[in-house]
Amino acid sequence: MAKVRRLTPQHPEMFRARVVRTRRVSPSMQRVTVTGPGLGGFPWLGYDHWFRLFLQLPHQRDLRLPEFTGSQWWQPYLAIPEDERPHCANYSVADYRRTAAELDIDFVVHRGPSGEVEGRAAIWACGARPGDALALLDQGILFDCPHDASEVTVVADETGLPATASIMRSLPEGTVGRLIQEIPTDADRRELNAPAGVAVSWVVRREGTSVPGAAALRELRRLTRADASGYAFVVGESTLATEGRRHLHRLGLPKERITFSGFWKHEAMAAA
């Protein structure tokens, strides 16, 4: 397998964009397609390419962004007065079309006990209209598969689905391994262009009875062996990421061959 070089840009570029269209991809996923004058030059690398998303506050007429040089954007961002500081969140590129200068962003739609959509970014996505402003700060990729990897194991909850779908499309044709993908409902399944040698397991979470990430972790723990020359990518709810890494390491996969990232943390209890 060709080496995928882990890349965080030294001088990340900020791209201003506007909404082109939106659509509900599945019951739990809202897609927002955006474009912008410079977006045709977005340095897309495939795999789990991610970015910082900046959204203007509801009362603002214009989107205010931090002014920075190099990669030091965080302090300039915090220096913006709180009532003018844009909302910032991390997202993966769901798809990118360079010729059209269009980029797709998938937002997980989670509803609280009242039935209302929760989360500032998800609320924005569900109400987004053509012309709405936003900005993307390129952050590169995390997927870091060694050139000699014998197999690939990818595990995620729904927050990692945009990344895993893109990873499946980006993997070389001869890749072998497995994907364990947790989703809230059976209707959230989607077509994945995975290599023929990658076994795809959809794990549907039991509505209202299971902590997000727990079902994927249970499925991963059914794995009783891991090739020490393989590679793993585990993302999603924090406990899924950390406990998934721990299990794979116990099976013999070296820590340096495991990429893990907690995209979020469940507020009530651990997924273990």
Protein language model features and the residues they cover:
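Extended, composition-driven regions rather than compact fold-specific motifs
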Residues: M1-A272
